[in-house]
């Protein structure tokens, strides 16, 4: 049954009249906006309102944001749901001229956009503009967003903390924002109040994001009067004042780790006693959004005890947009950690709501984006394990990071003829449309965006869409296969991926399904089977994306020419993404060949790597030619990696020089079965680290060679070193700075060169360098800094080889050992194998503490070697387990310990063939590449009712005693 509140045609007419009287400038509420849109649609169609009246009803059956249209009755679960129903009705009138049945109950309860304030000069033109905010929230409402998070003070001293820019707290008159007058402060508060209230009028829940309550170490304060003693009481009073002055603020998002500016040992007390208390004491319900990254022990308990509604969020794919699913495994702090834990009683919901943060701040900063299939796949993952939804960072969300001076737009002043928008966010209409409409209704018809392409580009609309869709795959794949830093410090839209040795050293961020260059080489050398994608497949993807984009752009250009304004402002982005795809296709292969050469001394791989980096440089030169003078030279969207493509040219040029040097070393010395680079001490690389890997910690060491310093003393575990320490001196090369290794620095001055000969060790006398080897006889080449070499033949004893330095003074840059025996023939590349049919009936429900069997059917299985199950609790802190089964009967038995009531079960299959390659199921290219089975405590059935007592023959009948 539906409980309905009828809004009569009189209400409809009255509301429309009221809106007309107001000039249509503002919406009194979501329902009024929806009604106004319906009226505009009737007018556009020339239909009389009195003959097309509608009835609106509240429904208790639909969710709050749901709606249905039946005849001329529109039902909604709330005013926002009714607004969505009216917007759908308006679209139907425009498209069809009449209403058609429709019903949507959104699977994602929260659908949010997040925006950051970072630059006073750039924000001056829109932040205080009421027309801007009305247009923005109208766009969000049309696209079915229901949340807007405006974040202040994100890793910057700008507006940190923001409270003194809004209010003066009588108890703390000494706390002031520097250079802000009372009039400016009042204007700031009034603007915040207007933004929050206007959001509400369009059905948008406004969230106030406060990420720093004090500046971080090394920043210049923009606020005076704060001390460690008063910051807590001041924050309590100020936040409370802001919330009371701005009733449209529905929730407050807090960052609570060290990046908040609050020292770790004070964070729990600060938030518990002041910030959370301010929310509780405001006098109305305000939701707490807690960013859960690196919380101190006790902070979650404090939030749960704050007696306000609590939401907890974490990152979907680090601080970038990768593939359309949370990675099966990644750095735990850059994913959902253990936040999807369920309460002890499985029928009880969590004490908090969980939602996903889709960070685009690292990757999708400037260029246009829109791929409906990607969005459909992503939004299907958002409800995983009861999550409430998502918020996402659109392009330009951090424009002007760090309050850098200067005005700049998407294009340079000379290219303003390409500007087809009034507000810059209008340029990204497809991004907003797809993420909003498809998260609200994943079954939305493609005509919603295809009609818009046709309206904007006419007969070329389909080709512009195809170009955009294919170009949009490029950045997501770069993030998935090559993410040098999960933080937003590297900008893949303009970054060439770092120096070639760094590129080859970086792991994929989707390492469960993509092999690193090192892993791929070892798999091939050791004959180890793996279904993971290789660089060859990745490069093929990049070149396919580029080709499809190029072809669609050419077709659109033939129709639109150079005179179409929106096309002229769209095509450059597509061209940039095409070239980025070509570049990374080349660099993927260069890195793959280079790592293979380092393992095998295969000279064809070395020359192939040289060819690929040369090709990559040519592509980057095209990028510079295309973008120079087109996009601004001083673009800043993050704390590092600012500037322009032309600022990065030195890096691919250095790659070419690096490979030239490697080829010259090969020609001069031949293969290095064991290679040692003599120089100063360096740090050991940390396995699986993204900042302390080999290319960073040993950037002054020739790749493929082991670093040797005077302190490198032989031990069995290391397998090489000096027999005795002492008497040795190093002539060291400096490390290449991290920012140059990763191609972040704009003016690199310390790029690597001459690594083997540029540093050295010198000594006097016959010191011995010992190496554990496989083989008997070796030629030892002691390389001098001038490039000449002392050669000798040495023999190993029991797997140990001693190379004696000459008597007298000596100085060497390195040591190469060449086995007299021919090198082993490596495993050939796997031949292609036809993919078999794979079937699995995934259980929807698993009972906790009970064993379960999972069956995978594979047929035909004649080319399948084994089937492997990977499984763990849905917890990024848990370790993946694996078990194998024959393909003829791939049945896996999980024990009772594997079905923990606190966690749902996450699992996927790897099918390995006889060629050493294979397939994953589910397929990462088509679906979320793992299953999530709900684990629930089995509730025993209620006991049967007691049996009726047997009839008593001596008892009198109901009518009384028998006479």
Named regions from a protein language model:
Residues 29-37, 41, 62-66, 70-229, ...:
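Feature activates predominantly on carbohydrate-active enzymes
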Residues 140, 681, 859-863:
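Short solvent-exposed strand-capping/beta-turn motif centered on an Asx-Ser/Thr pair
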Residues 394, 398-400, 404-651, 655-666:
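C-terminal non-catalytic alpha-helical accessory regions
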Residues 669-822:
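Compositionally biased, intrinsically disordered or flexible polar/acidic segments
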